[in-house]
Amino acid sequence: EIRASDWSSDVCSSDLEREGLTVIQVIFGKKGSGKTKRILDMANASVKEAKGNVLFIDDDKSYTLSLKPQIRFIDASEYAVKGKAPFYGFLAGILAGNYDISVIYVDAFLKLAQAEPAELVDFFAQLERLVANAQCDLVISFSEDAENVPESIRKYQI
């Protein structure tokens, strides 16, 4: 028989800390506005605090050497990830096979999703459910100004 008093305080407190948190964060900005540098810096800084593994997904290998070696790098172009459904399946597969991921960073998101911001409202709701169920955070760089994005996606802006 398991009693509440048998649970470690870490388990209970980590569950409480996740409640109400936004598990998706988006960095908006046009090309050349510093989004990639910011997301690379965030990924490198998160290695110290992350309770699990840190992943970085991009559409090519150009920033591989900019990341700390503890970060798992995935070049999505090697897996033909182009479109919303393939991207979702790719992410779901990664999370299904790796229970120890605490945060995923995605650069060049619009290139991978191949969609206009207005077409991503329902997709973001699906992504939020996916990463919340996996108890993982998702940080995305989005090559568009925030004012050109639906409000339901803008709420994730950091």
PLM feature segments, named:
Residues 25-27, 54, 101-106, 138:
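Generic beta-sheet signal
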Residues 35, 83, 87-90, 101, ...:
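Amphipathic alpha-helical interface surfaces
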